[in-house]
Amino acid sequence: MIAEKIRVALDERSYDIEMGAGNLDRIGSLCREVGLSGTAAVVSNTTVAPLYYETVRLSMERAGYRVVPVTLPDGEGYKNSATLNLIYDGLVDASLDRGSFILALGGGVIGDMAGFAAASYLRGIPFVQIPTTLLSQVDSSVGGKTGINHPRGKNLIGAFYQPKAVLIDVATLDTLPKREFLSGLGEIVKYGAVLDGGFFDFLEKNAKLLLARDKEALIQAVSRSCAIKAKVVAEDEREGGVRAVLNYGHTLGHAVETLTGYTRYLHGEAVAIGMVQAARLSQHYGFCSQADRERIEALVVALGLPTELPSFPPQQYREALSHDKKVRDKGLLFICNQGIGAYRMERLTDLGALLEICGIGE
């Protein structure tokens, strides 16, 4: 069932997000509709490939494509140059040329790495996103950010490279482990907290349905998240201005991931911590009320997500924050709450004060 199509309007690089439940077997037809030809390399991982590769392969072969698998180890810890080289090896071994393309079948790690491989292999071949986790469906598969991590920071190596299409099948969430599902809900909260107060109300009212993975509630939540992100990306594709709002919760969240070696927290869990801390900081500076801060924190808790920064010395936090991609000469760009559903961007030069407000003092 196709429930909706959302357009990401980027002139000649525009594309559709096709959303539904049980529509994964449409991938071959979709690739034909967007004009793709040649061999399709399906980049996936050892968790997702056993579940969905055959469905994708059969659909692609019915549409007349040659299909080759490139299967990687699973986990954020593998989002690095060594694993990226495994993708290149698979593409070279299969003799992919510039008339071929990549299907990114998996979560955010697969989408980011496969997208970066597509951007750089033979100086660029097309790719299609098939996100199978909630987090990747509402965030990383839309907008063209691709890349890998560096030992000193998250997503420090990458490129903006738009897919030809995105196919979202919320039925793939049925096989998603609970913790990863909750992690995706954390990223959804972001959109309501700083961009759409009505959507935040929806999340508060439908938290139980979302936790139960109700298909109708999920399609609404994923669709609204994608529509919000598509609008922001259309206004600011390369994060030169308003798109930075999508980093709400990510500044401290990325620091948490870096300090814990990408092993203790899932991305959405780290973002949830970052959002709560951003709301506390916003209340401290008078940008939002205590009631607004409490609503954000209560929704994060209701969705089973963490709220507190892990204990590390302030100097380690400062070091991690100093490598954030939003650092400029005038300080760290921090996304704050301006009530519920609105935001303001602040340049913070005193990282020590920021950490003290968040409970990490000397």
Swiss-Prot record:
Catalyzes the conversion of 3-deoxy-D-arabino-heptulosonate 7-phosphate (DAHP) to dehydroquinate (DHQ). It comes from Citrifermentans bemidjiense (strain ATCC BAA-1014 / DSM 16622 / JCM 12645 / Bem). CDD domains: DHQS (cd08195). Zn(2+) binds at E187, H250, H267. Its EC number is 4.2.3.4. One of its GO terms (biological process) is aromatic amino acid family biosynthetic process. It is an enzyme of class 4 (lyase). The keyword Protein biosynthesis does not apply. It catalyses: 7-phospho-2-dehydro-3-deoxy-D-arabino-heptonate = 3-dehydroquinate + phosphate. NCBIfam families: aroB. It is found in: Cytoplasm. GO terms for molecular function: 3-dehydroquinate synthase activity; metal ion binding; nucleotide binding. GO terms for cellular component: cytoplasm. Its cofactor is Co(2+); Zn(2+); NAD(+). This is 3-dehydroquinate synthase. Pathway: Metabolic intermediate biosynthesis; chorismate biosynthesis; chorismate from D-erythrose 4-phosphate and phosphoenolpyruvate: step 2/7. Pfam families: DHQ_synthase, DHQS_C. The keyword Glycoprotein does not apply. Binds 1 divalent metal cation per subunit. Can use either Co(2+) or Zn(2+). It comes from the Bacteria. NAD(+) binds at residues 74-79, 108-112, 132-133, 145, 154, 172-175. Belongs to the sugar phosphate cyclases superfamily. Dehydroquinate synthase family. Keywords: Amino-acid biosynthesis, Aromatic amino acid biosynthesis, Cobalt, Cytoplasm, Lyase, Metal-binding, NAD, Nucleotide-binding, Zinc.
